[in-house]
């Protein structure tokens, strides 16, 4: 197979996005082909919306996000088969598994439990497990990740190797509202049940979030040991729980409502990691 010319694809997508008001379901030719090829490459994991650099920073391929957005203008609404009880949906994005047989699933190498939903252009790596969950388009789920029941992986989100997203976890998307960078959960993190990480925040490698921790760009993440406050990023190997901080006093009173924050209570040690490590038996 010929290696795709990514520079040419990027150029076409960028130009098309600048002229997006003129793009619709009747658009054919170079623009449609570039968008469709970009989504196929995302679906295969040959490209990804964000890539970690050697210095630890993440580079965002904005043109791939733009390709995903352009696909909504190009594709008409249509019947999407595969609903419960042989019902259907009405949408613009087909299932990743559309037309798959046992051969495709064997080759992909991950487990997809009944009722999980993965949209076309999301990549799922080998040895990942998808419980009844939702993975949105453009997302990247790396090797050995567990996406537990009712967890949601938002558009273009990046989920690292051996990450465990517990039941009901929400990882925010970045298409609406359009954020600068995707939400990222780095390798070997454990995200506790019903927690939410949104707005392009990053949870660095090896961190553990307890149940019900909510992190957005404006959330104060307080290191209890040092008093340092972080925004938008959980440092590596942090153990984080939900907490509160004193708020300003209300006018004329000596009290005020406390405000939510996330608290780093310690750094993940061997005991913590043993409690949150993956179970290889589930991935055989």
UniProtKB/Swiss-Prot annotation:
Localization in the cell: Cytoplasm
Positions that bind substrate: 111, 148
Domain of life where this protein originates: Bacteria
CDD domains: LbH_THP_succinylT
GO cellular component, one term: cytoplasm
Keyword field contains Amino-acid biosynthesis: yes
Keywords (A to Z) from UniProt: Acyltransferase, Amino-acid biosynthesis, Cytoplasm, Diaminopimelate biosynthesis, Lysine biosynthesis, Repeat, Transferase
Catalytic activity: (S)-2,3,4,5-tetrahydrodipicolinate + succinyl-CoA + H2O = (S)-2-succinylamino-6-oxoheptanedioate + CoA
PROSITE patterns: HEXAPEP_TRANSFERASES (PS00101)
GO molecular function: 2,3,4,5-tetrahydropyridine-2,6-dicarboxylate N-succinyltransferase activity
EC number(s) recorded for this UniProt protein: 2.3.1.117
Gene Ontology BP annotations: diaminopimelate biosynthetic process; lysine biosynthetic process via diaminopimelate
Pfam families reported for this sequence: Hexapep_2, THDPS_N_2
Pathway in which the depicted protein is active: Amino-acid biosynthesis; L-lysine biosynthesis via DAP pathway; LL-2,6-diaminopimelate from (S)-tetrahydrodipicolinate (succinylase route): step 1/3
SUPFAM superfamilies documented for this protein: Trimeric LpxA-like enzymes
Assembly mode: Homotrimer.
Matches recorded under NCBIfam families: dapD (TIGR00965), PRK11830.1 (NF008808)
Family indicated by similarity: Belongs to the transferase hexapeptide repeat family.
Protein name: 2,3,4,5-tetrahydropyridine-2,6-dicarboxylate N-succinyltransferase
Organism of derivation: Brucella melitensis biotype 2 (strain ATCC 23457)
Organism classification: Bacteria, Pseudomonadati, Pseudomonadota, Alphaproteobacteria, Hyphomicrobiales
Gene name, Swiss-Prot/TrEMBL: dapD
């Amino acid at each position: 197979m010929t290696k795709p010319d990514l520079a040419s694809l990027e150029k076409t997508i960028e130009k098309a996005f600048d002229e997006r008001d003129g793009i619709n379901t009747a658009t054919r030719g170079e623009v449609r082909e570039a968008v469709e090829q970009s989504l196929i490459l995302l679906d295969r994991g040959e490209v990804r919306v964000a890539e970690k650099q050697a210095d630890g920073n993440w580079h965002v391929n904005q043109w791939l996000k733009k390709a995903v957005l352009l696909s909504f203008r190009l594709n008409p609404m249509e019947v999407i088969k595969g609903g419960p009880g042989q019902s259907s949906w009405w949408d613009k994005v087909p299932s990743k598994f559309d037309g798959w047989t046992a051969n495709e699933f064997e080759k992909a190498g991950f487990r997809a439990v009944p009722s999980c939903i993965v949209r076309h252009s999301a990549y799922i790596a080998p040895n990942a497990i998808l419980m009844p969950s939702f993975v949105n388009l453009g997302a990247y789920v790396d090797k050995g990740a567990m996406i537990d029941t009712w967890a949601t992986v938002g558009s273009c989100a990046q989920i690292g190797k051996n990450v465990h997203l517990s039941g009901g976890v929400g990882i925010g998307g970045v298409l609406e509202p359009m954020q600068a960078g995707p939400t990222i959960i780095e390798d070997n993190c454990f995200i506790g049940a019903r927690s939410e990480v949104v707005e392009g925040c990053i949870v660095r490698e090896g961190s553990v979030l307890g149940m019900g921790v909510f992190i957005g760009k404006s959330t104060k993440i307080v290191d209890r040991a040092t008093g340092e406050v972080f925004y938008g990023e959980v440092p590596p190997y942090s153990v984080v729980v939900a907490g509160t901080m004193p708020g300003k006093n209300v006018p004329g009173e000596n009290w005020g409502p406390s405000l939510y924050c996330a608290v780093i209570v310690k750094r993940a040690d061997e005991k913590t990691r043993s409690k949150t490590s993956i179970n290889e038996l589930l991935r055989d």
